[in-house]
Amino acid sequence: LLPEKCRRMLPSILDGSFIERAENLLTFGLPGRGKTHYLAAIGYEMILQHKYNVLFISTFKLVQKLLIAKQALELEKQLKKYDQFDVIIIDDIGYVQHSREEMEVLFTFLAERYERKSLMISSNLVFSEWDKIFKNPMTTMAAIDRLVHHSIILEFNNDSVREQEAMKALKK
């Protein structure tokens, strides 16, 4: 089951107005809590109900694409390609422990979308642990500041969905 706040907020999220306002949707919680599923389902509804252009991408894949573009001196061009999407879902931002170059392109991407286009992000790390992502305290604070400025923040503090399913399977 979804945490109470996530259930309560769902109707207002599904109306899509947060995308019109270039707001972000940030989900936090331990692995297996349903964050990715929640964001993917919202993204699917944004496509079906509102005809928004939505991209779902893992943090690792996003960073790799940005790095390749930077090395080819085409980072600006790659960032403009992402502008075609009304909202981009970035999955598992905390899993990738970034090098300085990776951190820089990820920060550039986040800063580029700030107040212009929406992001939906899942993370296993709370903000106090984001120094593991960005390494530099100032960059960490700047990234968090931009993301939370216009955001809906949801904590998935429920039991593990995978654990619940495993327990049900054992009982059969």
Predicted regions and their residues:
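Conserved glycine(s) of the Walker
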Residues: 34-35
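Hydrophobic positions on the alpha1 helix immediately C-terminal to the Walker A/P-loop
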Residues: 38, 42
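Post-Walker A helix-loop "phosphate-sensing" segment adjacent to the P-loop in P-loop NTPases
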Residues: 43-57
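Phosphate-binding P-loop
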Residues: 14-22
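N-terminal pre-Walker A segment at the start of P-loop NTPase domains
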Residues: 1-14
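Hydrophobic anchor at the beta1->P-loop junction of P-loop NTPases
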Residues: 27-29
